[in-house]
């Protein structure tokens, strides 16, 4: 625990806002990729991935050096381990190969839809897929002149009748079953 406290004081003293060297390297990689805004948790996630990949490569290279009966891990062992894991290679598939796979997949017909499956659309003549209007250009079209509209202020006058309790009681009473609801 004392080591982390010393590390924090060293990094803050150097003006790195409490980030370690590894975190600063990840942040600089993000900035080089054009990512200016990111969640601070992204840095720790990328550091976790970096640690996992590095430890996997080193474990593999350690196994390779032990198999070759070497006392130390050499750069060749690390390079071989990285090649075996495929970490450092970024070989994207060829465009032609992807197009060929897509064409092969698209040549296969889709399975037939069962007759009783889902909702069916009505016949085309009953579907409103076509426009239902015809635009007629009017040659005598003239734009209207803008007129200024003046609004008279509408004054709400106080009601002349006051709501009485008997009016409220009449409104709350149930209607007879033979009453017409439209009236």
Swiss-Prot record:
Cellular localisation: Nucleus
Keyword flag Transcription regulation: yes
Disruption phenotype: RNAi-mediated knockdown causes arrested development at 90-100 cells and inhibits differentiation. The two E cell daughters (E2 cells), which form the endoderm, divide abnormally early, immediately after the MS2 cells. Phosphorylation of the RNA Pol II large subunit C-terminal domain (CTD) is reduced slightly in embryos. Abolishes expression of taf-10, perhaps as a result of altered protein stability. Reduces expression of a range of genes, including let-858, rps-5, hsp16.2, and pes-10, but has little or no effect on expression of cki-2 and sur-5.
One of the Pfam families matching this protein, by short name: TFIID-31kDa
GO CC terms, sorted: nucleus; SAGA complex; transcription factor TFIID complex
Record keywords: Nucleus, Transcription, Transcription regulation
Gene Ontology MF term list: protein heterodimerization activity; transcription coactivator activity
GO biological processes: embryo development ending in birth or egg hatching; positive regulation of transcription by RNA polymerase II; regulation of mitotic cell cycle, embryonic; RNA polymerase II preinitiation complex assembly
Record InterPro entries: Histone-fold, TFIID-31, TFIID_subunit_9
UniProt similarity note: Belongs to the TAF9 family.
Function recorded in the entry: The TFIID basal transcription factor complex plays a major role in the initiation of RNA polymerase II (Pol II)-dependent transcription. TFIID recognizes and binds promoters via its subunit tbp-1, a TATA-box-binding protein, and promotes assembly of the pre-initiation complex (PIC). The TFIID complex consists of tbp-1 and TBP-associated factors (TAFs), including taf-9. Essential for early embryonic development, but not required for transcription of some genes; probably acts via activating transcription initiation by RNA Pol II, as part of the TFIID complex.
Quaternary context: Component of the TFIID basal transcription factor complex, composed of TATA-box-binding protein tbp-1, and a number of TBP-associated factors (TAFs).
Protein name: Transcription initiation factor TFIID subunit 9
Name of the gene encoding the protein in the UniProt record: taf-9
